[in-house]
Amino acid sequence: MVRKPVVSTISKGGYLQGNVNGRLPSLGNKEPPGQEKVQLKRKVTLLRGVSIIIGTIIGAGIFISPKGVLQNTGSVGMSLTIWTVCGVLSLFGALSYAELGTTIKKSGGHYTYILEVFGPLPAFVRVWVELLIIRPAATAVISLAFGRYILEPFFIQCEIPELAIKLITAVGITVVMVLNSMSVSWSARIQIFLTFCKLTAILIIIVPGVMQLIKGQTQNFKDAFSGRDSSITRLPLAFYYGMYAYAGWFYLNFVTEEVENPEKTIPLAICISMAIVTIGYVLTNVAYFTTINAEELLLSNAVAVTFSERLLGNFSLAVPIFVALSCFGSMNGGVFAVSRLFYVASREGHLPEILSMIHVRKHTPLPAVIVLHPLTMIMLFSGDLDSLLNFLSFARWLFIGLAVAGLIYLRYKCPDMHRPFKVPLFIPALFSFTCLFMVALSLYSDPFSTGIGFVITLTGVPAYYLFIIWDKKPRWFRIMSEKITRTLQIILEVVPEEDKL
């Protein structure tokens, strides 16, 4: 059984409860008649669902540094093969999540699926690492790319000061947090616009590339599978780069409870998004190779800029703006989705209860959104973020593979469970095996980094027993926790979701 939030013996519930009109009694607001229930609304349509998936998948990587795959494959042909295979494998994972999302109709993504199938301990470990390290570090990394590229047009002749990048990055992070705190609808609308910008940027690269092919610029595709020798032990790293570029297909499942008609919308949004992204990624890489050879691509710090300078002339100045908008879209979509993960984990008693509360008027999970802000700022101004993400990249695929393996378990354990969308069993089997295979080979290829990541992940086990299992916490601690919760409720104007009261 999942341990539910502890109900205080000191005060009634330990937190302030909103009245039927969604008002905190301590705020002294006059109650307007017929106000909506305080709960998250189903505002994610098919278009918004597609924009969430595409908007979070396509970040800066495809524009800045798709060379990670090429470095670890050794040839143009093998790199394009890896891009295609990673797209197909990501589609398999996404289809598996489509079945999980339409069978277990709860928000939270892999946290929820692991919780339902394998119990609270592995689910807690997943959200523990996500909250404290992975999500703040990942948000800081993509935000730094935003900061760098939004400033690039103003520093054409000189190096951009590192402090300026971090300051504008901090502003961008704050804007995203405020946007997601204030309105679900506006956040979704802006995500649609930013997704359109991403696809426009990709088309700006693909169309000239196709024209180059028509003109016969195919010299870089001759002997496509010959090139630098690359050990088979480096292929997992190529897959990591490829799969990382496709990461984001699972984010719609984080907001299942806010999706309109999820039984139809989730599978359809996933299929549309993955088809667009896979075709777009492969064609973008093909376009690069029509103008840039393998050696030049490996030396370039911003492949899209190099490509556009050669083919688009002065229009290449617009490329950094498109890259910055692409990064901003990934920031926005990631915060929108992951805040629901923290919201659900809090609702299940695995995070502080304030994180499962909703703003009485905006109907947004305000605390679950803003908790990321200080953590991301700490990551932004400290440490080597890339190394930290490398340490923990295996954990993402380990838990995603575990969640998809849970689908197979449910097929045999609960064969009569209602499944509006069902995939052939070989799809989740192949995907979960691939995830575990990548984790095993990463341990073989880079045991030091993977070992550090494994140790960091395991810190969630003692944390689980300390914060979740241990019920007999000191009275002073419980009193202090409740005072903090009530104070934050008043400041933030949040209450528990009405159906949970």
From Swiss-Prot:
Changing residue 327 to A: Does not affect L-glutamate transport activity. Does not affect location at cell membrane Does not affect expression level. L-glutamate binds at residues 135, 244. InterPro entries: AA/rel_permease1, AminoAcid_Transporter, L_AA_transporter. Glycans are attached at residue 314. GO terms for biological process: adult behavior; amino acid transmembrane transport; cellular response to oxidative stress; dipeptide import across plasma membrane; glutathione metabolic process; glutathione transmembrane transport; intracellular glutamate homeostasis; L-cystine transport. It is a multi-pass membrane protein. GO terms for cellular component: apical part of cell; astrocyte projection; brush border membrane; cell surface; membrane; microvillus membrane; plasma membrane. The keyword Transmembrane applies. Residues 1-43, 96-101, 117-130, 180-193, 256-265, 339-364, 409-422, 471-501 are cytoplasmic. Changing residue 191 to A: Increases sensitivity to erastin-induced ferroptosis. Pfam families: AA_permease_2 (PF13520). Residues 65-74, 151-163, 211-234, 287-317, 386-387, 444-449 are extracellular. Changing residue 271 to S: Does not affect L-cystine transport activity. Does not affect affinity for L-cystine. Significantly increases L-glutamate affinity. Changing residue 414 to S: Does not affect L-cystine transport activity. Does not affect affinity for L-cystine. Significantly increases L-glutamate affinity. Inhibited by erastin and sulfasalazine. Inhibited by (S)-lactate. Inactivated by p-chloromercuribenzoic acid and p-chloromercuribenzenesulfonic acid. Changing residue 336 to A: Decreases L-cystine transport activity about 50%. Increases sensitivity to erastin-induced ferroptosis. Significantly decreases the L-cystine transport activity. One of its GO terms (molecular function) is L-amino acid transmembrane transporter activity. NCBIfam families: 2A0308. Belongs to the amino acid-polyamine-organocation (APC) superfamily. L-type amino acid transporter (LAT) (TC 2.A.3.8) family. Disulfide-linked heterodimer with the amino acid transport protein SLC3A2/4F2hc; this interaction mediates cell membrane localization. This is Cystine/glutamate transporter. It comes from Homo sapiens.
